[in-house]
């Protein structure tokens, strides 16, 4: 089960998982550095059209989208990837 919370930034959402996502603390990943990322899961999310940045913690992801992208287009893919992870 994935819960979604709004953040103060309308271009960012917090996706909370019941499962552990990361065991290395908080990490930030930007689309501009996607080629340098070894984590396939993070790389896949960053390659979604409209995703700019991902902040990963133990049980949640905070995803920042481009201003002109729509959450209705991104949320289903993000949730699907999290459920499969």
Predicted feature residues:
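Charge-rich, low-aromatic oligomerization/scaffolding segments with amphipathic character
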Residues: 69-83
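Short, ordered beta-strand-loop transition motifs
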Residues: 5-11, 55-58
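Short amphipathic alpha-helix segments
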Residues: 33-48
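Short glycine-/aliphatic-rich beta-strand segments at the starts of folded cytosolic domains
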Residues: 7-32
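A generic structural motif
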Residues: 13, 59-65
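Short acidic amphipathic segments
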Residues: 45-60
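Short, surface-exposed beta-strand-loop junctions and turns on beta-sheet-rich folds
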Residues: 21-22, 61, 69-71
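Flexible metal-binding regulatory segments at protein termini and peripheral loops
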Residues: 3, 8, 80-85
């Amino acid at each position: 089960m994935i819960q979604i919370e709004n953040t103060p930034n309308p271009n960012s959402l917090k996706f909370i998982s019941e499962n552990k996502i990361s065991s290395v603390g908080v990490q930030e990943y930007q689309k501009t550095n996607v080629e340098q990322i070894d984590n396939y899961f993070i790389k896949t999310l960053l390659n979604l059209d409209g995703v700019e940045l991902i902040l990963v913690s133990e049980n949640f992801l905070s995803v920042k989208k481009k201003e002109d992208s729509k959450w209705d287009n991104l949320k289903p893919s993000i949730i699907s990837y999290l459920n499969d992870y």
